[in-house]
């Protein structure tokens, strides 16, 4: 009887852990990873790729902003990393209309903020952009 109670009590926990791990892996696979982020400099908990868009100018991936969520952790991209001054919400709005984002403001990460360098270019999503 006691083993049945233990099994029934632990089943929801096991299901939660299994589902939580699976969704994180699936979401991570959907992201376009930035090629310019030095992931070795990130916190050990920041193992997910940053949500990124691809430049039509040079076909490189740049992160959206300089802070992103990875498995409930806020991850800050290193200073000096090229980025786009865009939010995930803004990108999703544009991608509902077409396949590109016409006004991607370029910048560099500084203390967790993507600071504009005054350049604007067209960018696009290679894969579905989701937050992890």
Swiss-Prot record:
Subcellular location: Secreted
Signal peptide annotation: 1-24
Main location: secreted
One cellular-component annotation, GO: extracellular region
Glycosylation sites: 45, 69, 74, 103, 111, 117
Disulfide bonds: 48-70, 66-109, 83-114, 104-123
Gene3D superfamilies registered for this protein in UniProt: 2.30.130.100
Assigned keywords, A-Z: Disulfide bond, Glycoprotein, Secreted, Signal
InterPro entries: EVA_Class_A
A GO term for molecular function: C-C chemokine binding
Function text: Salivary chemokine-binding protein which binds to host chemokine CCL5.
Protein name: Evasin P985
Organism of provenance: Amblyomma parvum (South American tick)
């Amino acid at each position: 009887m006691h083993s049945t109670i233990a099994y029934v009590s632990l089943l929801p926990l096991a299901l939660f852990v299994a589902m939580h791990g699976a969704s994180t892996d699936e979401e991570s696979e959907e992201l376009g990873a930035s090629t310019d982020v030095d992931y070795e400099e990130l916190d050990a908990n920041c193992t997910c790729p940053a949500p990124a868009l691809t430049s039509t100018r040079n076909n490189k991936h740049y992160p959206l902003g300089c802070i992103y969520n990875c498995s409930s952790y806020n991850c800050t991209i290193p200073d000096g990393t090229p980025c786009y001054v865009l939010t995930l919400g803004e990108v999703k709005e544009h991608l509902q209309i077409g396949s590109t984002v016409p006004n991607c403001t370029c910048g560099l990460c500084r203390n967790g903020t993507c600071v504009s360098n005054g350049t604007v270019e067209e960018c696009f999503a290679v894969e579905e952009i989701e937050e992890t």
